[in-house]
């Protein structure tokens, strides 16, 4: 992914504008990671942020959607969620308040910015990263999208764009294999 922006894409995203979004969200991290840091995504990149450009905090709109993301991470590491969670992980409950996000929850919204379902659910992140980069460039605070795992929504909050108090850590608990199974079943 190049650091260059596609001007046409920037204009299409700017024309869509943002919505204010508030929700209780969930995120899992390694036990010693900061729940409200997007540094890992900055270093390695994520679906909605290219590597080495800006930090992004990935949040699921339900505990079940978060557990699907745990499954996806385990599959990418060629293991099971239960085996992966034998290491120390934490599940964080985070309150999101009035985050100005690019809403890509409808097929029409995604089409308007040049994304297809394969971009959302597939393994090639380049289209999503280009959209995320443009949204960040426009000082949007994040993007709201269907979760790649097919359950719920994900909001990617751009850490440098959020204001104090917009992301509030409510609770952190150990994410054990037993808790994973309980939450995945709901």
Curated annotation (Swiss-Prot):
Mutant phenotype after disruption: Not essential, it can be deleted. Deletion of the mbcT-mbcA operon has no visible phenotype.
Key word Transferase present: yes
Phenotypic consequence of residue 28 to A: Reduced toxicity
Effect of residue 58 to A: No longer toxic
Superkingdom in the source lineage: Bacteria
Keywords, sorted A to Z: NAD, Nucleotidyltransferase, Toxin-antitoxin system, Transferase
Molecular function as annotated in GO: nucleotidyltransferase activity
Catalysed transformations (reactions): phosphate + NAD(+) = ADP-alpha-D-ribose 1''-phosphate + nicotinamide + H(+)
Cross-referenced InterPro entries: RES_dom
Class of this enzyme: transferase
Pfam families xrefs: RES
Keyword Cell cycle assigned: no
Biotechnology (record note): Molecules that disrupt the MbcT-MbcA complex could be candidates for anti-tuberculosis therapy.
This enzyme's EC code(s): 2.4.2.-
Family: Belongs to the MbcT/ParT/Res family.
Function text: Toxic component of a type II toxin-antitoxin (TA) system. Neutralized by cognate antitoxin MbcA. Degrades NAD(+) by phosphorolysis. Expression in the absence of its cognate antitoxin MbcA causes dramatic reduction of intracellular NAD(+) levels and is deleterious to cell growth, causing cell death. In a SCID mouse infection model, mice infected with bacteria overexpressing this protein survive longer. Overexpression of this protein in a mouse infection model at 21 days leads to bacterial death, and shows a synergistic 100-fold increase in mouse survival when combined with isoniazid treatment.
Quaternary data: Heterotetramer with 2 subunits each of MbcT and MbcA; the tetramers further assemble into trimers with 3-fold symmetry. The antitoxin acts by blocking acces to the toxin active site.
Annotated protein name in UniProt: NAD(+) phosphorylase MbcT
Gene: mbcT
């Amino acid at each position: 992914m190049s650091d260059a922006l596609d001007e046409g894409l920037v204009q299409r995203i700017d024309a869509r504008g943002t919505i204010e979004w508030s929700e209780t969200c969930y995120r899992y991290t390694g036990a010693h990671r900061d729940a409200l840091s997007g540094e890992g995504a900055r270093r390695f990149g994520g679906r909605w942020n290219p590597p080495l450009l800006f930090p992004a905090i990935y949040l699921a709109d339900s505990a079940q959607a978060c557990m699907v993301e745990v499954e996806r991470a385990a599959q990418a590491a060629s293991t099971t969620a239960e085996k992966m969670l034998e290491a120390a992980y934490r599940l964080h409950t985070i309150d999101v308040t009035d985050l100005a996000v690019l809403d890509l929850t409808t097929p029409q919204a995604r089409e308007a910015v040049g994304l297809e379902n394969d971009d959302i659910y597939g393994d090639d992140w380049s289209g999503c990263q280009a959209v995320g980069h443009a949204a960040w460039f426009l000082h949007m605070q994040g993007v709201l999208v269907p979760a790649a795992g097919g359950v719920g929504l994900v909001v990617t909050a751009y850490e440098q764009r959020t204001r104090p108090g917009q992301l509030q850590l409510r609770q952190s608990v150990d994410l054990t294999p037993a808790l994973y199974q309980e939450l995945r079943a709901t």
